[in-house]
């Protein structure tokens, strides 16, 4: 039985032409703590990317996550989303 940890960002790279559903699912993954850790910065980033790709319901979830974040954390998430867009 596997007893290690899987780095989700390395294990499931998302291509630039990925469907919005995949990006949305990544937001849900980090917002819900499915990995055992809630990461609001990552959740905001993926919801933001899903919204940019046309997933309308990602906007509401991004807003909900942002309400639990500091301005610094939101800026970090936005920076990470911009970086992802430029590298993919």
Residue ranges and their predicted role:
Residues 16-23, 32-34, 39, 47, ...:
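Short helix-capping/linker turns of helical repeat alpha-solenoids
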Residues 41, 45-48, 63, 82:
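Alpha-solenoid helical repeat scaffolds
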Residues 23-32, 63-66:
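Hydrophobic face of amphipathic alpha-helices that form TPR/SEL1-like repeat modules
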Residues 5, 27, 32-33, 47-50, ...:
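Generic signature of intrinsically disordered, low-complexity segments enriched in small/polar residues
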Residues 2-9, 13-16, 20, 63-88:
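Terminal, low-structured helical/coil segments at or just beyond the last alpha-helical repeat
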Residues 11-12, 28, 50, 62:
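Residue-level detector of alpha-helix boundaries and kinks
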